[in-house]
Amino acid sequence: MYDFAIIGSGVAGATLAKELRYRYKVAVIEKGKKPSYASEGKNVEINYVYGLGGSGVYSLGNAIKTEIKGYKIDKDIYKEIWEELKIKAPKDDFLNDIDKAFIELGFEKMEKFIDFDRCNKCGECARKICKAKWTPLNYLKESNANIITEFNIKAINYSNYYEILDDKGRKIKAKNLIISAGGINSPRILKKMIDDENIGKNLFIDTFVTVGGILEDSYLNKDISMLVYKKYKNFMLATHYSKLLINEIKKDYKDVKEKDIVGIMIKIKDENNGVVLDNDVKKEITKEDFKTLARGICKATKYLYKLGVDDIYTTIPRGSHPGGSLSLVVDEFEVREGLYVCDASLFKEALGVPPIVSIIALSKKFVREIL
């Protein structure tokens, strides 16, 4: 029997496994194996990754420290994260000309958990695993946990210990259970165990769009996306090369080359009005979200015009940071004795910035102050 079973091998699950490794026998349960994208939602497309390492495997390596409402994080935890992930901003000689042009317009360099000396600027951070970038797989390797993949949970029973069963008849027994399957799947798993009408509510996704156009020889496709950014009150702008954007542009300019596409992501701190259902996710763009997106698009468009872009195109609204979906149900990590939740589903409101270092910080806090 395990001391702890952790459901989910993403940023939170991997951090927990690493933090618990010295004192406890730990199992990490993962639904998938090879990381694959999943997409849900109709009005706003919500993307996440299932598989070993979760969405963090295909992150852009961004590190932004921000306040987490309801959770005070000790400064030493952030210092530790910066050291463990070797977080730093790129040197000037790493920047492409397009990055430098944005900096002249008031953007700043993004700190990232990427070894810039090893990065070959393939532009494939969101689609390929590489050794230049930290991912949750690094923590999993350090954890010494028993990692069980392709485990599709069918039921979870409790009788002085937790018994997790999958659809192949496998059973895992543990004294304690931590659900860390992310903003979409954690509420679905918890719903197998308790009945609460608020499970799945309060969902946010950090809604974003990418706007851009044609700028010859900008070579943003051979750069790390979000390498430079500019932060505003409820939104941020960052350089972003998007396949969806080039598809829109090609409707008018069929022969346009990828090297000639420049884009800016507008990521907003959206309202938490979404809900995770058993087989669906509902998330609308509220009036306030629309206003925030419009302000961001207006700012981004002005920067693009200054760079020399004439025609502006935009992608559909999407979201890749689902969270908040258990914040109305779980208070301070514990559901009941021996049953916990720790991941972005606990966030009470959208961060509006890349959340990985915040999730790591939350997970470290949980192990050190609660367990």
Curated annotation (Swiss-Prot):
One of its GO terms (biological process) is thiazole biosynthetic process. SUPFAM superfamilies: FAD/NAD(P)-binding domain. GO terms for molecular function: iron ion binding. It comes from the Archaea. PROSITE patterns: 4FE4S_FER_2. Residues 110-140 form the 4Fe-4S ferredoxin-type domain. PANTHER family: THIAMINE THIAZOLE SYNTHASE (PTHR43422:SF3). This is Uncharacterized protein MJ1450.
